[in-house]
Amino acid sequence: MSEQNNEQRSQAAGTDTVDRGNSNAKLEQLEAYREDATGEALSTNTGTRIADNQNTLKAGERGPSLLEDFIMREKITHFDHERIPERVVHARGSAAHGYFEAYEDLSDLTKAGFLAEAGKRTPVFVRFSTVQGPRGSADTVRDVRGFAVKFYTDEGNFDLVGNNMPVFFIQDAIKFPDFVHAVKPEPHNEIPTGASAHDTFWDFVSLTPESAHMVMWLMSDRAIPIAYRNMQGFGVHTFRLVNAAGESVLVKFHWRPKSGTCSLVWDEAQKLAGKDPDFNRRTLWEDIEKGDYPEWELGLQVIPENQQDSFDFDLLDPTKLVPEELVPVRVVGRMVLNRNPDNFFAETEQVAFHVGHVVPGIDFTNDPLLQGRLFSYTDTQLLRLSGPNFNEIPINRPLCPFHNNQRDAPHRQTINRGRASYEPNSIDGGWPKETPPAARNGGFSTYHEPVSGSKLRKRADSFADHFSQAALFWHSMSEAEQAHIVAAYSFELSKVERQSIREREVNQILLNIDPQLAARVAANVGVQLAAPANPTPQPKPSPALSQMNLLSGDIRSRKVAILIADGVAESDVSDLRDALRQEGADAKLIAPSASPVQAENGAELSPEGTWDGLPSVAFDAVFVPGGAASSQAIGADGRGLHYLLEAYKHLKPVAFAGDAQALASQLSLPGDPGVVLGATATDVFPGLRQALMQHRIWQREAATKAIPA
């Protein structure tokens, strides 16, 4: 290709960020599969160059189309078959490439090589998702979020397929189809999309007490994260680590975001679902493109094998968590996401995660939900990705070579040489051969766990307590978080048509968790509260469960809207942007229209969004610079006033400099730490920074109920 075309290619093609050293071995492997059409001739799938891609071959200008038109037939046929089955759950997702870096040598716990060397980096591909809705549903619905990480280790792929909540709705995989059928849109009318606020879901969970703990998480702020980078992640199940000596410990996996754990408010989440249904996807993409890489730390809760029976819950029960006050989280590494995919379908849509993708040193427990997942994930890929060769798809291929006697099937890419496709064989020298277990690069050896018992269908008695940890979660929340949980239950149950379902949820589930919770919800949904039948649990709160204790302590990655109009004080704009940039935060200029804005000093400012196109729900705070004419224009426009009032109602910091301080009086905003006033942007910034660090101004929440929506 010519030098000119090479230059065109570098300027016009690709979605990568500029080179920031963000390549890795997996991305280098994918390079062989990347296609770039810049400067190339249009051709058929078989390489024949196309002279006319505008017209079907016809008999005369106005005559019938001819069947011999192989170009049209190939194009239409391919188009007709472009869609593949979407995931049954977790269909709506977004993903990114990155790396995991180990902090220390964990050889005392596991022989997994990617955890056995301090500083060792392992490529990863991470997919975040919602659960209930289809591919086209909104990002900000109330739902569990999937948090799946594929480690491309030297010893094979390890998939940590988790969620942003540490527990699940059911204890046994046999109930998974029932749960999913219940939460999905109802079969008679395919309503609702991306929501659990309907009869079949609440019918199921009100009849399934084991779901009580997880539903409490679902009704909490954890179900409406502000961004993927602000989510915790959990492996959900208890796994097993095995070292080279064959010694085992039990482990819970945790991802802790460096950006802090925080969420939207419910009204904000609903508005974002309409105004920017791609909000979480867009934020992840844009942050990576501008080099503001999301980062998490990996933590382990390690439980010695001989202590697994020392808790008042069963470690094999996926509806239970291990409180950090009982078993502290040991931070062992970090994960950085630093590159976006080149093609959504080829990477994000075709990636295949599976809890059974493990490497030597990581093993399973007898968690009955985990055991069922070990079957389900492979089974579902056979349909979704058209057969058993899904591991040959580039995004799924391991970095290490793989050799076995699996053969043929649809879309086979490997060209196997030799005559023997079985083992043992003598024709090909017995290859490929088994690898004995070893401290490094050995074969996988299942942990020798003693097992005994009769064949039966029964839950262990240790799985029977369904309300203690739901109560633990409730009592660990702040007053604001508890109010949000009550509001969420009330909203969801108000959508339930059958009074009997509402009554059962309140009187048979919530009343067994906490009488005050049940009473507050009952009053909102028209249910007569029953007398408590049993004493309710009174657990000691776990501070680690409240998001109020999980903020980052800085304002990195926060986004501030700067409202501008003609006559704005340009110095306030530049000073605040500079101050935010130094803290790792970002700001965008938002104006009445996309036309350039003339500052009071004659400078021309280019808006990066409009009041209608980038509403306040897209930002963490709003700042209005000084400038008499600009402030008057904003105060005379209902859209500008709504922008500020909506941000205030959503408990966000709103800051005013110079002449713009009059807007706070015009809107009758009561004084609180989030209403920041100052003569200049420099005066405003310390208070704005402090308010941003708190995420939201929770003490304002009660007062905002008087503000019309």
UniProtKB/Swiss-Prot annotation:
Primary subcellular site in the record, as a coarse category: cytoplasm
Biased composition (Polar residues): 1-26
Subcellular location: Cytoplasm
Cofactor needs: heme
Annotated GO MF terms: catalase activity; heme binding; metal ion binding
Family statement drawn from the similarity comment of this UniProt entry: Belongs to the catalase family. HPII subfamily.
Name of the protein described by the UniProt record: Catalase HPII
Organism field: Pseudomonas aeruginosa (strain ATCC 15692 / DSM 22644 / CIP 104116 / JCM 14847 / LMG 12228 / 1C / PRS 101 / PAO1)
Lineage: Bacteria, Pseudomonadati, Pseudomonadota, Gammaproteobacteria, Pseudomonadales
Gene this protein is translated from: katE
